Every structure is written in C-alpha cells, then in structure tokens.
Regions:
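Glycine/Thr-rich phosphate-binding loops of Rossmann-like dinucleotide-binding domains
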Residues: 41, 109, 156, 217, ...
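Catalytic-core regions built around general acid/base machinery
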Residues: 44-55, 131-135, 139, 196, ...
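Active-site-proximal loop/turn and secondary-structure-junction residues that shape catalytic pockets
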Residues: 10-12, 35-37, 64-67, 103-107, ...
Length: 266
C-alpha cells in the first residue's frame, strides 16, 4: 500500500503538531511542506525541527513561489536557484527526501496570445539543463532529490509531459534529479497516463495527487484504479501527496482523501 501525505495548507490546525494530529486521524502517513521565497523556508527551521522531535513526518517540500529556475529574467532565475538550494538543504536537515518544483509556472503558454515565447526552444533547453544540473548537484551533496514537475500546457510552455522531463533528466545524468508527477497535469497532457507512468517509471521519484478538476481525489473523473495500478506495477514506493483544491466542507474533503485513495488501489 502506498503512503499518503497532505500538503500542510490543506490541514486544519495552527501548528504542524496540530495538523499532524488531524492527519493521522484521517489516515495520512505524512505532511508535505510548502516553501515560500525569500528564504522563508529556512527561517522555519526551528519550527520544523521541533515538529520532527514531536513525531511529525515531513518527507517532502513543494515550492510555493512566483518565479522558478526556468524564468526568462536572469535575476529571477538566479534567485529561484538560490531559493531551491536552500529548500533542498532544509529538507535534508530534517531528514526528508526531496523538494518538488516546476520549470516555470504562469510565465508563458503557447496556447494563449502571443503564442510564441520570447526565448527559443534551444535556449529554453540550455537554461533548464543548466538549472537542473546545478540543483541536482546540490541535492546530491545534501543526500536528497530534486523532483521536476511537468505542468499542463496552460501553465508552462517548456515541460508538460513525463517524456520531456525524462529526456532532460537523462541528459543531466544525475540520480538526484527525478520526475515529480502530478495526476492533474497528467490527465491533461498524457494520452494514456497509466502507460506514461510505466514508460518512465525509472525516472519517477515523487507523486502529487488531485482529481481531473483540481479538487481532492474522488471529486472528478480521473481513472484512479488505472493510475494507481500503474504506480504499483512500476514498483513506486514513494508518497502520494495531496496537492489540490477542496470542494464541499474543507475539513471533510481533506479527511476523505486517504480512504478514497486506499479504496481505489493505493
């Protein structure tokens, strides 16, 4: 059975300890952290260390910033790399597994005007390889993993499918860089999400879950049995981290996720 986590902002409670108490009661195995910019995640280290001492399980962190390592602007790109390095170091310090980030988010979409980005595909690739290599080397030194998340075509123009992420990771050639898959984005971009998991299984390091409409698993029409079944066949042993919006009563919605996923084959 796969382990299930909830991102911290979804859980009721003021402290990580209170959130963890609720999470355990609902059937979760862990909390996925969120990391804002301006080195905010590093400033939380005393809080995180105390939570760890109190038994809170926090294996992964997901970036929560407005710019990313694939940014068009050199200064923003450099800052994103500095932030991600810090986040990787912090998650390593609390005994975690890794940090998840997309190449970019909301910066450009080929599906919306003006349709052609200001940077060539060749330069995009160079930028992504440079960033992934630098971050991957830092992750390796810290003993953790960088998870590259493909986003759908309306949110990013560079890495939309598992195939694209896998190609970049192969070229980087570091075991410390892996794909962080997301069921919502895969539902939009992959013609066969389950087959995509099987095809790229060696490169998958982390999984985030939400349904076809971005709400909690069970609120949409994603084929969970096929998706989860593919992860089992692929030998995936990581976490399923709920990164979603909530429909209905938010407390009951987040409470419903573990039972739904387990009932669907997790």
């Amino acid at each position: 059975m796969l382990k299930i986590a909830a991102q911290e902002q979804l859980l009721p409670g003021e402290s990580l300890q209170h959130k963890w108490e609720f999470a355990q009661g609902a059937g979760y195995d862990a909390i996925e952290l969120r990391a804002k910019g301006d080195l905010h995640f590093a400033s939380r280290l005393p809080e995180l260390k105390q939570a760890l001492k109190d038994g809170v399980v926090m294996p992964t962190v997901c970036v929560d910033m407005l710019h990313f390592f694939g940014a068009f602007d050199d200064g923003l790109r450099r800052d994103a790399i500095v932030q991600m390095k810090s986040q990787l170091s912090v998650i390593a310090e609390i005994g975690g597994l890794g940090a998840q980030t997309p190449a970019s988010y909301g910066m450009f979409s080929r599906r919306l005007p003006p349709f052609e980005p200001p940077r060539s595909e060749e330069r995009d690739r160079e930028i992504l390889l440079e960033g992934l290599t630098e971050l991957g080397e830092h992750a390796s030194a810290e003993g953790v993993t960088l998870y590259l998340e493909p986003l759908n075509r309306y949110e990013d123009h560079m890495v939309n499918r598992l195939e694209q992420a896998a190609e970049l990771i192969k070229e980087v050639g570091l075991d410390s860089v892996r794909i962080g898959i997301d069921s919502y984005h895969m539902n939009i971009e992959e013609s066969d999400p389950a087959q995509a998991i099987l095809t790229h299984a060696p490169y998958i390091g982390h999984a985030q879950v939400s349904d076809s409409n971005r709400f909690q698993p069970g609120a949409g029409h994603l084929d969970w049995q096929a998706w989860l079944g593919a992860l089992h066949i692929a030998g995936y042993e990581g976490y399923l981290a709920a990164e979603c919006r909530l429909t209905g009563d938010p407390v009951e919605a987040v409470r419903s996720v573990p039972a739904f996923l387990k009932g669907s084959g997790a």
